Structure formats: structure tokens, C-alpha cells
């Protein structure tokens, strides 16, 4: 517990003091609308996409040429896409701070999930001025 408390105090001083969070990684499967994934692409450091569903092979299976192009051009942004993603705790902290009160409900749901991770209260949400964090 002594190490966790030390890490927690360093996290409060900012990213430059919390380098240890870069080494704590979480792997998860997320099923979200494509418009949400476009916003998630903002976070490129401390995250890695391990796999994702291909619209061409999943929903557009069997289409070729102009039919395939027309399908992809008209593909709704609300369609769900599943991806397996890796995040560092440092990136999850950044996401949490920036998106916990976002107007898209998917971000609030994602931030609620972040709070369920081991030691999230000491390493991710600590010092974020959340009453219930």
C-alpha cells in the first residue's frame, strides 16, 4: 500500500511526475458507434488498437466496385463497431479528466467504466475534484 500511496501523490503533481502510469496497461473490448471512435482517435499516445471490425468484411461482405464504394460512402456514423484497445493508466486519466462531463453519453459511460478499474480512485481519478471519484 505504501507504493500505491506514493504513486497517488505523484499523480497529483501531473503527468511529468506520474510516468509510472505509462507502464500500467489495460486491455478491453469496446462496442461503440463510429462517431465515438472518431473522437477516441484524439488519444494516440498510450493507446494501441489491437483489432477492429472491418465494415468492408462485416456489413459490406460480398460488395465490390461501385457497390462497395457507394456502401462505404453512405455508411451511417451511428453504426456500432467493436474494437479491442489497450490503454495506459496515464491515458485513461487524461481521458477521464477531459471527458467525464462530456455531452455525449458514451463518454460518460466510458468514464464510469474507468472508475471501476483496480486502484482507479488512487491512480486515475485522484485529484480530479470529483465528489464520488
Where are these regions (language model features)?
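Family-specific signature for flavin-dependent thymidylate synthase
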Residues: 1-133
Amino acid at each position: 500500500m505504501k507504493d500505491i500511496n506514493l504513486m497517488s501523490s505523484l499523480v497529483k503533481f501531473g503527468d511529468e511526475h506520474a510516468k509510472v502510469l505509462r507502464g500500467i496497461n489495460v486491455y478491453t473490448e469496446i462496442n461503440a458507434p463510429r462517431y465515438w471512435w472518431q473522437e477516441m482517435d484524439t488519444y494516440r499516445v498510450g493507446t494501441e488498437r489491437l483489432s477492429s471490425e472491418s465494415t468492408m468484411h462485416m456489413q459490406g461482405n460480398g460488395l465490390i466496385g461501385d457497390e462497395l464504394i457507394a456502401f462505404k460512402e453512405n455508411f451511417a456514423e451511428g453504426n456500432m463497431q467493436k474494437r479491442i484497445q489497450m490503454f495506459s493508466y496515464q491515458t485513461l486519466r487524461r481521458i477521464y479528466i477531459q471527458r467525464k462531463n462530456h455531452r455525449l453519453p458514451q463518454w460518460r459511460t466510458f468514464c464510469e467504466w474507468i472508475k471501476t478499474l483496480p486502484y482507479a480512485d488512487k491512480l486515475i481519478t485522484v485529484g480530479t475534484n470529483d465528489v464520488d471519484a
